[in-house]
Amino acid sequence: MRTIILVCSAVAVTAAVVIAQQRINPTDPQPTCAMCPGYYVPLSELQAYTKKALTERLLDQQVRDIEIGKAHIGIGMVHRGKLDAPGANSVAEHDQVSEVYHIIEGTATLMLGPDITNRQRRPSTQLTVREFNGPGNNGDQIRNGVSYQLKAGDVVVIPAGTGHWFTKIDDHIDYLMVRIDPDKVTPLKNEAQSKEYLSKPAPRDQ
């Protein structure tokens, strides 16, 4: 019996050594985010951001900004009210941050395209530039843009440098936004910072 136990222990130790060697083998691909934890954002927290948007008349809010090794990933919640026609200089474009929208509620018309007319640099002091989506431009129109009718459940992918322009919002639209920031131009935001943000009035651009 003792011999069997010793053999089993030796096998276990050998297996552990083999696994460790496999992990540190320099010829193997290595994780781009070594020993990074996973992250969870509950629905209740996302709903708190939507409630805050309605109460304080906010549009875009950053819920998290997470380090994943070679990039930052931002999670935002956006609420937009009714829009009969687009405002002047309302095309948006971000130089380094790509965005993915998942529509939660409402309907709207969104135009996408890279050819933006009358580009104007967004101020570097702007809150969204500093904390949400980094440097970029606004513009008047998107030349040869493609329009999409958005509804709940839809997903939109907007690469960095692509113009995006809400031209009509029927009543309102709420969506969750994932921001991909490979150059890490936006600051990190954790759960504790999110709770602190939700506990008091939101900062605004001066």
Identify the role of each PLM range.
Residues 92, 98-102, 147-148, 155-156:
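His/acidic/aromatic-lined binding-pocket segments of jelly-roll/cupin-type domains
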Residues 1-4:
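Positively charged n-region of N-terminal signal peptides that target proteins for export
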Residues 19-95, 188-196, 200-206:
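A short, N-terminal "cap"/entry segment at the start of jelly-roll beta-barrel domains
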Residues 171-187:
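A short hydrophobic beta-strand segment most commonly corresponding to one strand
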Residues 140-145:
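Short alpha-helix capping/helix-loop boundary micro-motifs
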Residues 148-169:
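Conserved metal-binding segment of the jelly-roll/cupin
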Residues 7-16:
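Bacterial N-terminal signal peptides
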Residues 95-114, 125-138:
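Short, conserved beta-strand element in jelly-roll/cupin
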